[in-house]
Amino acid sequence: MFQQFNISRSGFGTYQKMMFNITNNISNAQTPGYKQTRVELATLFPIILQEAEVKYAEDEDLNPYIKKKRGIELGTGVRIEAISTDFSEGNLQVTKNELDVSVRGEGFFQFRKPDGEIVYSRAGNLARDVDGNIISQSGYVLDPPVRIPNNTTKLTIDPEGRVFANVNNEAIPREIGQILLARFSNPDGLKNVGNNFYQETIDSGEPLVEVPGRNAAGQVVQYSIENSNVDIIKEMMDMIMTQKGLELLGKAMQAGEAMLKAGMGMT
């Protein structure tokens, strides 16, 4: 009875976390550069009830049958092993904003937080602060920094990340900065720190900072943003299945609790 209740409880808690992950993906379906996440499950360590000898053929010429000890196992539930990120590229959406930039390749934009920490993102819906610095939507300054001069009438970002500004309607633009991209040998090892940002880890390896258009970092495309890669139809179907699982596990927990109370003489 205890085992049945514990298995149902572990499953219910796991399905709740799966539901949270699904709703988070759905809520970010329109977030530029967002990468969907997936919950990876694993079984809890089973209980060995007893051992049995099983005969199986190995080498019929030398030894036709070998006896092998084999345990009879009882499952104990399920757990979340990891939450992985799908870094596949989202579709490109054309815009009319000169500070919208997408990456066609493996690279990440680099941003510096107020505390000096560097974080990485695929979201290229950039903005400009009061000092003219190019920033993320969260206010983090692009790294290396690029400052847009006052009275800039036109801003151009080429595929190699060079930033040009026409000031006071000048005919010839001036180069004011360079956007660099970071890529990782193992992007799956990046740590998701929220708000569409990632941190490097030992597993991700150190960033390889490159000029766009070289190697695998990819080019930058102005007047465009990368849409999220969330498959909204799949997420909705997963939500329905997960909700059904929660309902069944909830009933199993109630039945297990009733059996426990009956066994203990409780009403």
Language-model segments: what does each one mean?
Residues 1-267:
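Amphipathic alpha-helical polymerization modules
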